[in-house]
Amino acid sequence: MNREQIHILFFPFMAHGHMIPLLDMAKLFARRGAKSTLLTTPINAKILEKPIEAFKVQNPDLEIGIKILNFPCVELGLPEGCENRDFINSYQKSDSFDLFLKFLFSTKYMKQQLESFIETTKPSALVADMFFPWATESAEKIGVPRLVFHGTSSFALCCSYNMRIHKPHKKVASSSTPFVIPGLPGDIVITEDQANVTNEETPFGKFWKEVRESETSSFGVLVNSFYELESSYADFYRSFVAKKAWHIGPLSLSNRGIAEKAGRGKKANIDEQECLKWLDSKTPGSVVYLSFGSGTGLPNEQLLEIAFGLEGSGQNFIWVVSKNENQVGTGENEDWLPKGFEERNKGKGLIIRGWAPQVLILDHKAIGGFVTHCGWNSTLEGIAAGLPMVTWPMGAEQFYNEKLLTKVLRIGVNVGATELVKKGKLISRAQVEKAVREVIGGEKAEERRLRAKELGEMAKAAVEEGGSSYNDVNKFMEELNGRK
């Protein structure tokens, strides 16, 4: 083959939930013969360097690397070290959303550096996060196709699009009144509270308008999903929303072996082998895994309800508590745990404070259910592992993903969340207990388990040679080759 090697730049937004799937994508394209370069800032480069080096050791003939872009926080009016969402999540002040907005708008500082690098390297394509709408203009200026990466499902993108076009929330009595999203396959019922509608007159609303406009003028969209999972919505999206969309996921399946699965994000707060040994001692399908994503810190009152609910369910569990370091202590002094909780549940439950090797855990045969916030990375990792889920959406587009799990795929049990977590309504211990019992051993548990297992097999088939996602990678690379 005399074709020039394809070179793709990957530019993730600086947050773990955005960096991890684009790292997976960079590895996927490297495995398919492309040269992959990840663009990021100094602090985030340190997070990506270790998994990239490990990947290169295992695959010395493949090309993958990092280009560091300067991001002078203090000069931009940000606190020292404010280079990713982790910093903002740990920022213990009431104006943390204002800091997030300032951080978001400050990323445009990298525009000139991006353009210089594109000009110098002349890559085949730029895959840039949706949070960088200005990247479309940068790529266009130099004649390089810009692909958008949203990091969510086609289903959620279709829901958002139709909410914006039809504005059904304007036609109901209140923000908690349910309505059907018009024009979509199936009856998707939601409320304005759950849809997390952005006021278009606010700075954030105006930013989203820029995001949509940049997508319209971009070359296309790369979706971390697989066609069979949401075919009606993938077709709808290609017909009405995006000119071109390639479904190339689940991206988490581009990780092979224990070390690669364990090394995707930050260093885990538990020894992987110790965790696997604990799981090996449990009956298949008997453990429920709870994790609410890297960006969700729940109040102590809610953690207490979860603890009582778990204990009441009688199930084995692994519970990942992702709170800020100054909020989570160790041992029995923690005021978010019932007195004597860990002692009473020794052998039955495992609490991981901080970061967990999630894909490694979900893939273990002992796991029988996953309690999730319905962030798309976690949702798709649960689907790829063939697991039924307890859905507990908290913000962003998570209520849409919940509808996909509970109403379309029918592999989810709703814990009872009806509005965004920031509104402060607690889920009770009784609700937690009921949902956990139901997902593991309820009346419809077996039916749900079989459907989830089938979807897991379909996910794995999609990324194998001849599968739908494998073929979409081919089609995308052929399209890039055709542009030369």
From Swiss-Prot:
Specifically expressed in roots. UDP-alpha-D-glucose binds at A356, Q358, H373, W376, N377, S378, E381, E397, Q398. It comes from the Eukaryota. This is UDP-glycosyltransferase 73B4. PROSITE patterns: UDPGT. The lineage of its organism: Eukaryota, Viridiplantae, Streptophyta, Embryophyta, Tracheophyta. Plants overexpressing UGT73B4 show enhanced root growth in seedlings grown in presence of 2,4,6-trinitrotoluene. One of its GO terms (biological process) is response to toxic substance. An anthocyanidin binds at H18, N89, A396. InterPro entries: UDP_glucos_trans, UDP_glycos_trans_CS. It catalyses: a flavonol + UDP-alpha-D-glucose = a flavonol 3-O-beta-D-glucoside + UDP + H(+). Belongs to the UDP-glycosyltransferase family. Induction: Induced by pathogen infection and salicylic acid. It comes from Arabidopsis thaliana. Keywords: Detoxification, Glycosyltransferase, Transferase. Gene3D superfamilies: Glycogen Phosphorylase B (3.40.50.2000).
